[in-house]
Every structure is written in structure tokens, then in C-alpha cells.
Regions:
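Mature N-terminal, pre-catalytic/accessory segment of carbohydrate-active enzymes
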Residues: 1-2, 140-166, 170, 175-189, ...
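Conserved catalytic cores of very large enzyme subunits
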Residues: 1-143, 179-181, 190-193, 197-760
Length: 760
């Protein structure tokens, strides 16, 4: 690592323990000009974006070459943003659980267009459309909002340019004076004008990202290696920069994503409101979230350091060639060396991926960085083409959102909802009522004891899940058009493909693709529970339905022997056992087939199935009663598509084989398997890396979809609990994000330690 990056890293880790100040509460555009109330809401939103760019705090940090600091926010603890809506608009939105913070994020801007054209050209494009639009007031308002919003980037960049110019006069060395002057010059050019150099391209992307993340948009940066490489290549060939300078520039860029991290939970502020989760969570999510945040059992602390900032490298180009380049490798190497948790790094592999990308991936995973997340192009791309109807060129150009969900890069409006299939089983067993509080959680399918065959029981369960899907999709379709009435995204819409051509905000069906992912949640627990019922109740008849339900109602109290039996003697998903895996295959087939029916009926949005919890598995388990697989009431669920915690006993390959028995092209939004591994039985590091590379190739060959690997021994995790300062850079994967282990609450750490430690 270069001397500059070493200093930046040292500064960064010191700042982790300093309180980050929140800014922007109680601001309003009406304080500046009360007459703005007469303007259309989308234009008022754009003016609020300008206000943020004009007034937000700015600073240039020591040694850095890329400048810009987004305002403080986080997925776990909310946002701040100036008021632009009237009282009447706020009241109307609240009736459908929305507010000005109801911006979904999870999208990729089309950065290639920004770099190629610059924002000024996009503003001129919007003006041209406006001039041609005379009889559609809604379209005119949209174009006016984009024309107003995009210059916010120039406002912010100009402020940084002026600050850099001032600091040049205060610089202690000639070298730093020169760097400040270069930064000032670049900030006066990009992102409004096209980028011409590697430094300009990086600063252009970061300035836009800073504006987006300071104005409620939690966006990712997409295929960063594909759009940055031409600038790097040209500068290297023209000898404008050296390899070390390129690493300094890229490293300075990557560090910026981590600058809002806080490792001292006492510094966390809660700015969460009902609107922050209104577009994807269940109705009681805010209440549950706040309760969980203050509960000693779990904390949302890990989400306080999450901003949905993903980048993805390598994989096929739109033309079908391998896209691995020097930036692909350098991104992985630098995030590894700098020991960052942001940006989240993902890598796209396929059957012909070059050895060099596998090598840097395996070395990062072996170090224990819990990154990169591995995507299999040979499953994802055909899945998009066959089952979502996406043209192959756009499918090959897929990216991911802030966690892992796959979507065509720069062209997609995306949303998801949790379909809690374990609650569907609870509903079937308890006549539509929660085991925790008796509240209605589903339909009453009658007395489950009267379902006298496995086939009848399984069919009843699948109907329960379909009912839950119906509710989620009906809500999505019913309330979709409410969002632009309170929370349009004019800045993002201006840099999202097709919005300008259609004359529509992204939230008004402006993007080329609209994907909604109903994500199966609690998969492994549901399938393991169904295996218990099939085997013990219907086949062996050693357990009555009445006794099982009684045990669940009593949270397994008085039935510990039975609980241990179902946990240890009945086959479990994740062990390459066809008995239980076949139940999962049949269930997933029914689930995907039902969504196929919806895709035949609804033509303006596409439903993309997946399996996912993200980092929310404690909260998602908190609302579930005890389950037939032996899980206790309110215990955390397994993450994503992973085996239940501690139930995968036959090694990582067996876990992967269980997960790939279903055709994963049909789970085309994604279904990550999260594994914890250890090299303690391997003779040396190089042998371990070779084994890991072989495992990754096998994962691709077997038809896997998404894989995460955290390489850390149980003993190391326990030692980190005792001496957190010695392990401040220890990272673990939490379903949808990577977190510093020491920042998690102890119960969350303990839950992670319970995960099976697979050896090679």
C-alpha cells in the first residue's frame, strides 16, 4: 500500500470513533421563500436538492485526492432532508404510510452517460424535451424538476473548488499546494462537463454520489470497472499517471464510501421515521425496528453503517466477452488492503473467468474481509433473459443494488418486499393467528389435524404462501402511484435511462425496467419444519399434530427431548439430503410458478422472485413464534438462502449442492448462500487460497446464484469480543452488508458465532 493510502487509512480508523454530526433537521425551502409553495411538488423537491448542495457542510480531509462528504444518514437510523411539502400533502401521504423520506434507493444511476456527456448536456436534453412538450403539464413539470435538480451538482462542486483553491494558499508543501489546485480545477469542470482523465472520472462519479446520498437516495455505483477503465487505460498509455498514482486516486475514491462509519454506538443518532421503510417493509416495521433497537437482545447497530453502496466488477460485457480489466482487480485489492466495509464489493464470475480475478477474490476472502460477494453470470444472465424477458445485452450488463439484488445497470427502478413463509406455516398451524399474541397473520385454513395426508397439508401450506403473496403484490400495485405525489426523485431520474425520453420521473414508471422482488424469508426454517411434519406426523406417525402445535404454543416448554430430536434426527436443508431438499424444490417451483402467472397478467411491472433476509434476520425472526424445526419463539432466522444456523454439518459443498437442486435461473432476483469458513486445518495460506479458488469454480459449475464467504475461526471471534480494540478491522457478512464485528451488540455477535465453521 502506498504511503498516502497508509496515512488515509490511519486517519479513517481514528475517525470511526469520533461522533459524526447530523445536519439538515428542521430546514425548509419555505424559510427562504414562502411563495415557493405555489410551485409543483417535483420542482419544490428539486429546489430542496439545491438547498442541500448550497448549505451542507463541506471539508477536504488530509491527504485525499477525491473530495466530497455526504450528509450523515444510514439505513438503520434514517435520513434528514429539508421540508418541501405542504401540510396538506404531508397529511395525504401519511394516510398511505409515506412521507418525504419515502425514497426507496436501491437503484444504479447510469454513470456512463454522466462521464460521457456531463450533466450540462443532460440538462440541455431536458430543456429540448420541455420545448417540444406543450400540452402535457405533468411532463413539463417533470422536465422542469430535472432542469432544476441537476445543477445542484455544480453548486456543490463549485463550493469544493473554491475550498480547494483557498487551501492551496494554506498548504504546507508545494506538492499539496499543487494537489489542491488540481482538485479545484477538476471540481470546476466535472460532473457538469464530460470527464477526460481518470482523476476527473473518479471525482465526477463521487460528486454525483455525494449529492444523491445527501438527498435521500441510497444508490450504488454499478459496474465501476467497466466505466472507469477507459480513463485509466488512456492516462497510463499517455503517461499522465503512474500505477502508484492510479492506486492513490482509486484508493482515495474508495475510502470516501467509508467515512460515515461509526464504531462507537453511543454516537449513533436515531432519525428513523415511518416513511423510511414504507415502500418495502410490513406495516409494523417501524414499531418493531425501534423496539429492536432498544432491546438488549439485538440491535440495529450494524445497519447504522449501511448505505446500500455496492459496486460490482468483472463478468460479461454486453457483447458477451469477459470484462475483467485492471480496475476490476485493483478495486478488490484496495478494499482488501484498506480493510473497508464500504463500498460493498461484488464480483461477477462465469465458467470462463480468468484466473487473475479468481485469485484476487480468493485472497480477499481468505484474509477474512467477508468480501467480495460472488455472482454467477451463467445463472443470473439466462435467468433474466428467460424469465424476466430482458434483452440479452441488458442482462449481461446487470449490476446489483445496495445489498445483492440483481438488476440491469442504470435502467431499473427496483423494490422488494419480504414474504415471511415461516409465518405462513405458523398461520396454517394456528388457524391464521400469531403464536406470540393471537393477532391475525393469515387466513384460517381450518383445523390442521384434519389434513390427513402430507399432500393435503403441503397444498394447504402453499395456498397460505400464495395468499401472502397476493396481499404483498396487491399492496404494491395499489400504492405504487402514491409515491411520486410526495417523494419524486428528479435528480436521479435525470441520470436514469429512459426517464427523459418518456417524460416521467423514475417513480412514475420512467425507467426502462420496473422490478419488484417478493423475497422468500425464513426459507430454511420453513423447509426444515415441513420435513419434521412430513416425517414424524405423516410418515412415522410418531408425533401428533396436536402435540406439535401444543409444543409450539408453549415455546417447546416441557418438550425439550422432542425439540432435540427434531433438531438432530430429522434431515435438514444444507446437507445434500434429498429428503428435505426435495420439499424445498417443490415449494420453490410453486412459488415461482405463481409469480409467473402474475407476470402474464401485469404488463407494467415485473415480479422477480428471490430468497432474502438481508441483515434483518433478527427482526424478521422477532415476529415469529416457535417453529417445528426446534427454533424458539422470536429467535433470529437464518440469513437469506442459507441453511439454518448450525444445521449444515456436511461441509460447504453439501450446502451448495442443497441450494442448487432447484433451477436458480428462476430465482432471478437472487438467493445468496452465506457461509463461514476456516483455514485452520490447511497447511499454509497458499494451499487454502487454491482450495478456495477451486470451490468458487465449483460453485459456478453447479449453477449457484450468489455466494458470500466469511473466513474466520470461532476462536478469533471470541477473542474479538474480549479485546475489541485489537480486532477493529475484523469484518463479517450479515446477509445484505459487511460489518465490523466489534460494532455489533454481543447477542448479535453470539448469533454469528453459532454459524457452522466449515473447514476444507
Amino acid at each position: 500500500m502506498t504511503e498516502r493510502l497508509t496515512r488515509i487509512k490511519d486517519r479513517l480508523f481514528q475517525e470511526y470513533y469520533e461522533k459524526k454530526e447530523w445536519w439538515g433537521d428542521n430546514l425548509s425551502i419555505f424559510d427562504d421563500d414562502p411563495s415557493l409553495v405555489e410551485k409543483p411538488l417535483p420542482v419544490r423537491k428539486a429546489l430542496a436538492v439545491q438547498k442541500v448542495a448550497r448549505e451542507m457542510p463541506i471539508e477536504i480531509k488530509d491527504h485525499e485526492l477525491i473530495v466530497g462528504v455526504p450528509t450523515m444518514s444510514s439505513v438503520g437510523f434514517g435520513h434528514t432532508f429539508p421540508r418541501y411539502e405542504t401540510d396538506e400533502e404531508a397529511e395525504a401521504a401519511a394516510k398511505v404510510s409515506l412521507n418525504r423520506k419515502s425514497v426507496w434507493g436501491h437503484h444504479n444511476p447510469y454513470y456512463q452517460k454522466i462521464l460521457d456527456k456531463g450533466l450540462n448536456a443532460i440538462v440541455e436534453e431536458a430543456k429540448s424535451f420541455l420545448d417540444k412538450t406543450s400540452d402535457d403539464e405533468e411532463k413539463r413539470t417533470f422536465y422542469e424538476s430535472v432542469i432544476t435538480a441537476l445543477p445542484a451538482a455544480e453548486i456543490l462542486a463549485s463550493r469544493y473548488g473554491a475550498l480547494a483553491e483557498y487551501l492551496a494558499g494554506e498548504a504546507e508543501t508545494e506538492e499539496r499546494e499543487r494537489e489542491f489546485k488540481v482538485m479545484a480545477q477538476i471540481c470546476r469542470k466535472v460532473p457538469m462537463e464530460p470527464a477526460e482523465t481518470f482523476h476527473e472520472a473518479l471525482q465526477s462519479v463521487w460528486t454525483v454520489h455525494t449529492i444523491l446520498h445527501s438527498t435521500l437516495n441510497y444508490t450504488s455505483i454499478g459496474r465501476v470497472d467497466q466505466y472507469l477503465y477507459p480513463y485509466y487505460k488512456k492516462d497510463i498509455e499517455n503517461e499522465l499517471i503512474t500505477e502508484d498514482v492510479a492506486r492513490d486516486l482509486l484508493g482515495s475514491f474508495l475510502v470516501k464510501f467509508n467515512e460515515r462509519v461509526q464504531l462507537n454506538n453511543e454516537h449513533i443518532e436515531n432519525h428513523f421515521t415511518f416513511g423510511d421503510w414504507s415502500q418495502g417493509g410490513d406495516p409494523d416495521l417501524e414499531t418493531t425496528h425501534l423496539k429492536m433497537s432498544n432491546d438488549e437482545a439485538y440491535t440495529y447497530g450494524q445497519s447504522s453503517n449501511h448505505w446500500l453502496q455496492n459496486c460490482i466488477v468483472s463478468g460479461y460485457t454486453p457483447e458477451g466477452e469477459d470484462g475483467t480489466n485492471k480496475i476490476s482487480l485493483m478495486v478488490i485489492e484496495l478494499v482488501n488492503e484498506l480493510e473497508l466495509i464500504d463500498p460493498l464489493v461484488s464480483v461477477r464470475l462465469h465458467k470462463d473467468s480468468p484466473e487473475e480475478i479468481l485469485d484476487v477474490t480468493a485472497r480477499f476472502l481468505a484474509k477474512g474481509g467477508a468480501q467480495p460477494t460472488v455472482f454467477n453470470d451463467d445463472t443470473v444472465v439466462p435467468g433474466m433473459v428467460k424469465h424476466l424477458g430482458i434483452p440479452v445485452e441488458d442482462a449481461r450488463d446487470y449490476s446489483n443494488d445496495g445489498c445483492w439484488e440483481t438488476l440491469p445497470y442504470g435502467r431499473t427502478e427496483f423494490g422488494y418486499g419480504h414474504i415471511e413463509v415461516l409465518l405462513s406455516l405458523e398461520s396454517l398451524l394456528n388457524r391464521g393467528k400469531s403464536l406470540l399474541n393471537g393477532n391475525e397473520i393469515g387466513s384460517d385454513s381450518g383445523d390442521p389435524a384434519e389434513l390427513d395426508t402430507w399432500e393435503k397439508f403441503f397444498d394447504a401450506y402453499k395456498r397460505q404462501v400464495r395468499d401472502r403473496l397476493d396481499v404483498a403484490i396487491d399492496n404494491k400495485l395499489t400504492y405504487y402511484d402514491e409515491v411520486p405525489k410526495i417523494a419524486p426523485v428528479p435528480f436521479l431520474s435525470g441520470i436514469m435511462e429512459d426517464c427523459l425520453a418518456k417524460g416521467r420521473d423514475m417513480t412514475q414508471r420512467g425507467a426502462r425496467y420496473r422490478l419488484y422482488a417478493p423475497l422468500i424469508t425464513g426459507f430454511s426454517h420453513a423447509i426444515d419444519s415441513l420435513a419434521v411434519i412430513k416425517k414424524l406426523v405423516f410418515e412415522e406417525k410418531s408425533l401428533t399434530m396436536e402435540r406439535l402445535i401444543s409444543a409450539l404454543k408453549n415455546n417447546w416448554g416441557g418438550e425439550e427431548q422432542l425439540r432435540q430430536y427434531v433438531m438432530n434426527k430429522v434431515p435438514k436443508y444444507g446437507n445434500d439430503d434429498d429428503y428435505v431438499d426435495s420439499i424445498g424444490v417443490e415449494f420453490l417451483d410453486d412459488y415461482c410458478s405463481y409469480l409467473d402467472e402474475y407476470n402474464q397478467k401485469v404488463d407494467w411491472i415485473t415480479f422477480a422472485p428471490g430468497v432474502g433476509t438481508f441483515e434483518n434476520y433478527p427482526r424478521l425472526g422477532y415476529v415469529c413464534g416457535a417453529s417445528p424445526d426446534g427454533r424458539l419463539a422470536q429467535a433470529a432466522l437464518a440469513s437469506n438462502y442459507s441453511p439454518s444456523v448450525g444445521m449444515d454439518h456436511n461441509g460447504p459443498t453439501a450446502a451448495v449442492k442443497s441450494s442448487t437442486k432447484f433451477d436458480l435461473e428462476r430465482l432471478n432476483d437472487g438467493c445468496p448462500v452465506d457461509l463461514r469458513m476456516s483455514f485452520k486445518h490447511v497447511d499454509n495460506e497458499e494451499e487454502g487460497i487454491d482450495i478456495l479458488k477451486s470451490f468458487l469454480r465449483s460453485y459456478v459449475r453447479l449453477g449457484g446464484n450468489i455466494l458470500t464467504v466469511t473466513t474466520v475461526e470461532t476462536e478469533t471471534l471470541k477473542e474479538a469480543q474480549k479485546k475489541p480494540k485489537d480486532y477493529e478491522s475484523l469484518r463479517v457478512r450479515l446477509g445484505g452488508l459487511t460489518a465490523y464485528f466489534v460494532q455489533l451488540a454481543k447477542p448479535q455477535q453470539d448469533e454469528y458465532i453459532k454459524r457452522t465453521e466449515h473447514g476444507f
